[in-house]
Every structure is written in C-alpha cells, then in structure tokens.
Swiss-Prot record:
Biological source species: Solanum lycopersicum
Domain SCP: 32-147
Sequence positions bearing Pyrrolidone carboxylic acid: Q25
GO biological process: defense response to fungus; killing of cells of another organism; sexual reproduction
Protein name: Pathogenesis-related leaf protein 6
Gene name per UniProt: PR1B1
Length: 159
C-alpha cells in the first residue's frame, strides 16, 4: 500500500473517530445517563426514552435554528444552546450543575440563581424523556429535552 493510501486511510479513520465521539455524546443513552445519574443521587427512579417526545423536541429544535433563541414552546422542557462541540450530554450536565442553587428545605433557588432546569431533571413524576439537537444558522447548537409528565409545578417539591 502506498504512502498516499495509508495517509488517506488514517485520515478517514480519524474523521470517523471524531464523528463517532461527537455522535456518542448525543445518543438517547447519553441524554438518559446524565439525567438518571442526577436522579439516582436524590433517590428518584430512572427515566426512559420516548420516541414521540424526541420527535417533538427535534422538531422544535429545528424550528429554532434560524435565531437560536431559547424561547420555550409551552411543553415541559429544558432548553440550552452552546457553541463548538456542544453536545446533548453537555446540555444536561449544564442543567444538573444548577443543583447547588436548589435548597430542598425551602424548595427555592438560592441567591437569585437558576435551579429550575435541575428540578425538572430530577422531577419524580417525569418518567419519560425525549431530546433533540439542531445546528443553528449562527453555528451554535440548540438542544431541547421534553419531559412527560410535565414537572416543575410551582409549590411542589421535585422529589
């Protein structure tokens, strides 16, 4: 095999490895793993993937690709956007990172910080999940996860 063919083969393998590593961070299992890890930490059972919710989330993400604005659709959802290689796993980790801002005793976000993405992730009654990811016109990624049943009811604790 000539040097050119070996170089071409190595380049193809590297591209496939990069593609696989990016896609591996956006599979249903990746979204579920981060959700279910966070839920297990507070004694809440795991979620399961719902293809219908995923389809709705993907359609909504696609519809936001023009402006990439985090405008809620009205469904029970968490939204995120990010540049570079922003993945579904990274979006869920971003929501889970709000945990220190949630005070269970008062059922409030502390210090004026955000925590309601986190409370939706661990909402006990939300047992089905579907997520979508779309590339925005500005090059960023828009990620939407839908939950069923909807959580984050004002005045109720997530677990």
């Amino acid at each position: 095999m000539g040097l050119f063919n070996i170089s071409l083969l190595l380049t193809c393998l590297m591209v496939l490895a990069i593609f696989h590593s990016c896609e591996a961070q956006n599979s249903p299992q990746d979204y579920l793993a981060v959700h279910n890890d966070a839920r297990a930490q507070v004694g809440v059972g795991p979620m399961s993937w719902d293809a219908n919710l995923a389809s709705r989330a993907q359609n909504y993400a696609n519809s936001r690709a023009g402006d990439c604005n985090l405008i809620h659709s009205g469904a029970g959802e968490n939204l995120a956007k990010g540049g570079g290689d922003f993945t579904g796993r990274a979006a869920v980790q971003l929501w889970v990172s709000e945990r220190p801002s949630y005070n269970y005793a008062t059922n409030q976000c502390v210090g004026g910080k955000k925590c309601r993405h986190y409370t939706q992730v661990v909402w006990r009654n939300s047992v089905r999940l579907g997520c979508g990811r779309a590339r925005c016109n500005n090059g960023w990624w828009f990620i939407s996860c839908n939950y069923d049943p909807v959580g984050n009811w004002i005045g109720q604790r997530p677990y």
